[in-house]
Structure formats: structure tokens, C-alpha cells
């Protein structure tokens, strides 16, 4: 089974242009690490011109800490297709950078242990949130000279129960199978403006990015404290438009079980820095959790 690119040439470039863009993001890449303390990372999934540098900070940190065997990648299901909790079952994903294999045994073990997820490829067919993470992973894996595998998971249902179930199931499955694993939670933060039908505050255009950041930081602080319930409480209180809290929550639970003690915000920006549009502002953050 092969999953071909759905958004190459749209969210990110193809061919030499992709390599050039990734190289520019990673021009400050340090030496490959061997500590392997990172348990989970958060990265955005907008077009690379908006959020690519922010996403690269997560993968730079992983490269300099040490690569895992498997990346379990969560992404919100924007298309509504397929199962509401869907793990890609087997085969490989194709990108302009080449192919990357799915750890089918790991995926099946997570489904078996969770009791709430399905093996389903349809949910992934056109979804961009996981696809845009892969060139970053392929780039650092090639730099390290290693082959890594992935377990892609799309979420159409995102709440504390789903996060707890999947975070624990990934921990149990990875322990049972002996998989060295990092969770990647693909998410953007606030989607502000008339374009998104979400205008909880108003201000001059130049003021809005800082206002968006202030609201996003209420959630980010909870993530940095490994506070799953607090994160969802803040989201509900603000009616916040963060699109991937379920994957972040699973990363929090998994990291707790892995005895992670520290989380760090590596980079934050908004789409306004590029678009200058006050009618559609999205927040982007790079976060890591580590032992």
C-alpha cells in the first residue's frame, strides 16, 4: 500500500526547491546527538512559507538529541473522511524526498491496545497535516544516515479521553515491541480573523499578532507543565481554535509515562509575519518534551 503526496507543490515545494528550502531552515543544524531524551514534539502544519522554519526547530532539536526508530505522527482530520481515529495500516508514504515505511506491527498493536482506534487509509488520503511533517523527518534521517519508520494517526475526535487512551496505548505498545519512539503532534494554534469566523478580540493590525500570542501562550504554558486537563480547560474557556489538541494531549500522556521532566518552547510565530493579513492570523509553535 502506498500513500502518494496530496499537497506537494502546494504546502511545500517539489524537487530541488524543496531541498533548498529545507537546507535554509536547517543551516544552523548542529552535530547529531546520541542522548535520546526527547519523548514528544509539537510542530505546525501550514505552508512552509508560513510555518516551515518553526517546524524545523522541532526536528533540529530531535536531530541534535538523537533520532528514534519510529515517529508516531498525529494530525487533525481536516477532511472528515474515514474513521474518526485512524492509523494508517501498512506500506509506505511517498514524498518528493522519497519513501518512508509505516511500522504496521506497531500500528496494529496500538489499535489493539486502545480499543477506540481503527486501521484506515481513507482518513489519510488527502489530509495534509501529517504529510507536511515527512520531508523534515526524511531530511534529518538522511543527514544521520539512518532509516526511520512512521505510524500516522489522524484524529477527528479530540478530547481528554482520546488523548489518554492513545498516549497510554502508544507507551504500552512501544514498550511491548521494544520500539524507540517519539510522538509528533502536528498542530497549528489560534486561527483568528473573519476568514475563520473567530474574532474574540479586536485591535489595530500591528497589535493582533501579540494578542494572538497571548491567547496561545495560555495553552502553551499548560503544555509546558504537562497539564492535559488544564490545556483542554483553557481551550474550552476561550473556545480556542487550536486544531490538534488531541495529538498534543497524547504526547503529554506518553511523555509523562516516559518520565519526561522538562518541556521547552523553541519557537513561536504567526502567519501575519508573512501575510500581513489581519483577517486570517494563525499561531505556530515548536515545542519539545524530554526526560
From Swiss-Prot:
Gene3D superfamilies: LigB-like
Pfam families assigned to the protein according to its UniProt record, in alphabetical order: Memo
Highest rank taxon of the organism: Archaea
InterPro entries: MEMO1_fam
Family: Belongs to the MEMO1 family.
PANTHER family referenced in this protein's UniProt entry, alphabetically: PROTEIN MEMO1
HAMAP family xref list: MEMO1
Protein name: MEMO1 family protein PH1626
Lineage: Archaea, Methanobacteriati, Methanobacteriota, Thermococci, Thermococcales
Amino acid at each position: 500500500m502506498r500513500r502518494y503526496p496530496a499537497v506537494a507543490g502546494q504546502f511545500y515545494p517539489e524537487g530541488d526547491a524543496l531541498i533548498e528550502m529545507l537546507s535554509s531552515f536547517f543551516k544552523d543544524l548542529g552535530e547529531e546527538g546520541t542522548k535520546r531524551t526527547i519523548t514528544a514534539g509539537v510542530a505546525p502544519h501550514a505552508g512552509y512559507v508560513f510555518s516551515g522554519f518553526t517546524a524545523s526547530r522541532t526536528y533540529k532539536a530531535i536531530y541534535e538529541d538523537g533520532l528514534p526508530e519510529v515517529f508516531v505522527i498525529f494530525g487533525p482530520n481536516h477532511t472528515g473522511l474515514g474513521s474518526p481515529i485512524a492509523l494508517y495500516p501498512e506500506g509506505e508514504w511517498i514524498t518528493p524526498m522519497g519513501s518512508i515505511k509505516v511500522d504496521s506491527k506497531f500500528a496494529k498493536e496500538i489499535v489493539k491496545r486502545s480499543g477506540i482506534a481503527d486501521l484506515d487509509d481513507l482518513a489519510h488520503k488527502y489530509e495534509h497535516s501529517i504529510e507536511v511533517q515527512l520531508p523534515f523527518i526524511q531530511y534529518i534521517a538522511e543527514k544521520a544516515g539512518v532509516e526511520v519508520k512512521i505510524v500516522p494517526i489522524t484524529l477527528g475526535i479530540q478530547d481528554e479521553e482520546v488523548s489518554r487512551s492513545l498516549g497510554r496505548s502508544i507507551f504500552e505498545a512501544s514498550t511491548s515491541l521494544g520500539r524507540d519512539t517519539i510522538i509528533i503532534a502536528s498542530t497549528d494554534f489560534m486561527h483568528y480573523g473573519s476568514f475563520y469566523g473567530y474574532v474574540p478580540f479586536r485591535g489595530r493590525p500591528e497589535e493582533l499578532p501579540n494578542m494572538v500570542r497571548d491567547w496561545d501562550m495560555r495553552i502553551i504554558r499548560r503544555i509546558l507543565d504537562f497539564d492535559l486537563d488544564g490545556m483542554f480547560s483553557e481551550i474550552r474557556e476561550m473556545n480556542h481554535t487550536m486544531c490538534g489538541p488531541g495529538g498534543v494531549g497524547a504526547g503529554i500522556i506518553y511523555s509523562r509515562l516516559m518520565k519526561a521532566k522538562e518541556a521547552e518552547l523553541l519557537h513561536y510565530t504567526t502567519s501575519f509575519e508573512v501575510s500581513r493579513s489581519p483577517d486570517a492570523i494563525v499561531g505556530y509553535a515548536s515545542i519539545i518534551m524530554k526526560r
